[in-house]
């Protein structure tokens, strides 16, 4: 009987874990599908964030009222101007069962006539038991943590 219960527990838990994308794949999809997560109303994005980071996005949205808030640049770029060139590479820097740091390395193009600079942004992901990855923090190419910036006292 105990063996049967153990097998049933593995079967019921197995598909949920198997259905979760790998951390780098999750980060790539988040980048592609939710690039402006930092600038719009937070409600549509909350399902992809931890409750803690979601609360900070809500706080920042309330503070900024749809205008520039604590960030005066695109956090993916680490700049106001320019664009992300190709190729964009996602790789896991550290990973444990409940946390991962994924780096996004890309050529930053400010002026097409000049060689691009290498920029790296980091997505800090968390996973709770029986859940998939969620964004817990975002570190800009400048090294600024959105969690830290968004939790700053309002001026």
Regions found by a protein language model. Name each.
Residues 1-4:
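Positively charged n-region of N-terminal signal peptides that target proteins for export
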Residues 89-92, 120-127:
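Hydrophobic/aromatic beta-strand elements that line small-molecule binding cavities or substrate pockets
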Residues 32-66:
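Short, solvent-exposed secondary-structure junction/capping segments
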Residues 20-38:
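Short, aromatic-enriched amphipathic alpha-helices that serve as compact interaction elements
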